[in-house]
């Protein structure tokens, strides 16, 4: 992602929300949720590491790039789920170019709410002087991916804030 390339073999996160909540799909059906962790941000797309998908000169995620890359991911999953293509009855693909329209905090499609460099992560998130979830405003607490301990930790910042509040 840092080089602006579509990974030839992406890190893939797969979940089945209907395994815990069958009401999320029609009876007898299921949802397969797929998340890719390391894609170039919108406007920073420079090429395809596998050399198979053409990307626009402006580096933006187009529907064509998004869908072609989704096809690559499905092809890879088919190695582990042989009948996957035959059982797909619909799909909804959201790419980095779509994310800011869904959540204003996902600037340029960055799902991590900013840099995850060492000086912007863990105790230094959002700033070393902030002291975790506390803010300079009395009784205002900061939670979410932009705060300690960072993105991808399923509500941990809210848990830490609730413990600090008592």
Predicted regions and their residues:
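Short, surface-exposed linear patches
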Residues: 3, 35-38, 56-57, 110-115, ...
């Amino acid at each position: 992602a840092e080089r602006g390339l579509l990974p030839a073999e992406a890190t893939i996160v797969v979940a089945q929300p209907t395994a815990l909540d069958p009401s999320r799909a029609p009876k007898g059906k299921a949802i397969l949720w797929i998340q890719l962790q390391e894609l170039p941000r919108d406007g920073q797309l420079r090429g395809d590491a596998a050399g198979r998908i053409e990307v626009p000169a402006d580096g933006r995620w187009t529907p064509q790039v998004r869908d072609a890359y989704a096809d690559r991911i499905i092809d890879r999953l088919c190695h582990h789920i042989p009948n996957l293509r035959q059982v797909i009855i619909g799909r909804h693909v959201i790419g980095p170019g779509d994310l800011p329209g869904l959540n204003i905090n996902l600037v340029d499609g960055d799902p991590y709410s900013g840099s995850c460099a060492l000086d912007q992560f863990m105790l230094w998130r959002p700033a070393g002087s902030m002291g975790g979830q506390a803010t300079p405003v009395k009784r205002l607490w900061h939670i979410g991916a932009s705060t300690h301990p960072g993105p991808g930790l399923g509500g941990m910042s809210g848990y830490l804030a609730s413990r600090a509040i008592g």
